[in-house]
Amino acid sequence: MLKCIKHEYGIKNMKSIRNFSIIAHIDHGKSTLSDRLIQLCGGLSEREMSNQVLDSMDLEKERGITIKAQSVMIDYKNKSGNIFNLNFIDTPGHVDFSYEVSRSLAACEGALLVVDSTQGVEAQTLANCYTAIDMNVEIVPVLNKIDLPNSNADKVAKEIEDIIGIPALDAIRCSAKTGEGIEDLIERIINDIPYPKGSINSPLQALIIDSWFDNYLGVVSLIRIKNGILFEKDKIQVMSTGKNYYVDQIGVFTPKKLNKNQLRCGEVGWIICGIKNIIAAPVGDTLTTAKNPAKNMIIGFKKIKPQIYAGLFPLTSDQYEMFRDALGKLSLNDASLFYEPENSVALGFGFRCGFLGVLHMEIIQARLEREYSIDLITTIPTVIYEIELINGKIIYLDTPSNFPNMNDIKIIKEPIVECSILSPPQFLGSIIKLCIKKRGVQINMVYHSHQVLLKYNIPMNEVILNFFDELKSVSSGYASLEYDFKYFQSVKMVRIDILINSEKVDALTILSYHKNAQSRSREIVDKMKKLIPRHQFDISIQAVINNSVIARSTIKQLRKNVLSKCYGGDVSRKKKLLQKQKDGKKRMKKIGNVNVPKTVFLSILNSRES
């Protein structure tokens, strides 16, 4: 039976504090392990417990993934009767949310590397582990799901040693579902993870790990105290801006919100200062006291830049103001979300947004639609290109419609990512074929005991759309992927403009690898022909590269039978009526506008189908 106590806060000895993250691949049981730690250490009663306690968003529970990092403080009394204060952060496992992992690790001295003992090491496990090692975080390997009949903990422990290169033969074996091995895990955390360094007598230095917006309280920030002590009612300063605020409330999550009157060196907690401007407390910034400020800011986590860009437009223009405010609130607790205003002739006013990947984009879109009731159109995602012009100037662009004339461009360079793919050997042939199809170049291939680690350099534009889905398909779901930007490489790209009755539709302009241009153009033109409603005149749809039409289709006009009342008689009367109709159609085509419903754009621009 675990010897746990219920939240005896105010531990003065920093040697009793352990700050750690839980990192793992998606579906390896980290959220369930968090639930078990909370339950067994008395964080919540049996009645208050629910599956995936820390996955607070409905989207997280529906998709079965962790999107936002969540923190909890619990207290534990070990076998010697000593009280330890455990602060742990549950982190996402999907490749798109690796920035959340780096933020969590910046606040910790240790990390539990949770690996499913039925599946083994995955590519994202590898990436997160190397991130932790680079940040000098102590790694504690944990083999989860030992209650399952197909568990092979010894094999997976050897895999961890072979692939990652850290000792794992004595790794903790546990089952987050049944609670088996959890007590041993807590003892290992206490023994192996170092206590936080810092001085309670030094000027306050607090790292902002995360922030979110509360409609009633304003900005709520999750912080880690690196040095000093923070009291309620203190006057604090945001070091990057120099602005001062008074502390209204401070506290911790247990995981219930619990108010305190102070946070001490080494602790992780939340702070409310009545900040209403959502960019006034940026994630990664340092807080200090205005009276006795620290000299230097804390070196925070690695800032992540957006990898893909897409235009987001409200379906109706009256939702624009609401959309702008919603993006501002979402960007507060998502450091990687970038946005700037954009205007499209076809879609109206919206925003050009930057994301870490397609899943990240889909999550943001789903949150905007669900939490703020905004109906959106999302354009086809693109990457950022480096362009060298004839005059020697270098520019970076992510919007195809803004690309200069191809005759003014000397070189176009596209971003290349290094993809690490872990897979059982039997799927190797199919995966190599897929990588070649995506213009990949093999860098390395290493055989381990039961898996193969493939490294390929692949254009990011090929990876972001549906590479992950295709990889899962050809490997029956067993392969895992992790990728990282490496460099820009010259490529022959072409800009494809879509014209409707000779008028360019900016929202449908795309960039394509020159060998794929014909097929992509034909797909879009054929799709538009099916979706655009017929008018009283012919509608021509053209795909154009440098004023040369490479694909074309025509939507035939609706035609009234003007001869329906002519029962015989002079043929000249029929010819006159037909000529009159023909002249009318010509005039209509000159002055008539093609009505393209926004639902057509919604269907054409669907990222998965495109």
Curated annotation (Swiss-Prot):
Protein name listed in UniProt:
Elongation factor 4
Q: What is its main location?
A: membrane
Q: Write down the InterPro entries for this protein, in alphabetical order.
A: EF-4 (IPR006297), EFG_III/V (IPR035647), EFG_V-like (IPR000640), EFTu-like_2 (IPR004161), G_TR_CS (IPR031157), LepA_C_sf (IPR038363), LepA_CTD (IPR013842), LepA_IV (IPR035654)
Q: Which residues form a coiled coil?
A: none
The task this protein performs is described as: Required for accurate and efficient protein synthesis under certain stress conditions. May act as a fidelity factor of the translation reaction, by catalyzing a one-codon backward translocation of tRNAs on improperly translocated ribosomes. Back-translocation proceeds from a post-translocation (POST) complex to a pre-translocation (PRE) complex, thus giving elongation factor G a second chance to translocate the tRNAs correctly. Binds to ribosomes in a GTP-dependent manner.
Q: Where is the tr-type G domain?
A: 15-197
Keyword Repeat listed? The answer is: no
- Protein family: Belongs to the TRAFAC class translation factor GTPase superfamily. Classic translation factor GTPase family. LepA subfamily.
**Taxonomic lineage:** Bacteria, Pseudomonadati, Pseudomonadota, Gammaproteobacteria, Enterobacterales
A GO molecular function assigned to this protein is:
GTPase activity
Encoding gene, per UniProt annotation:
lepA
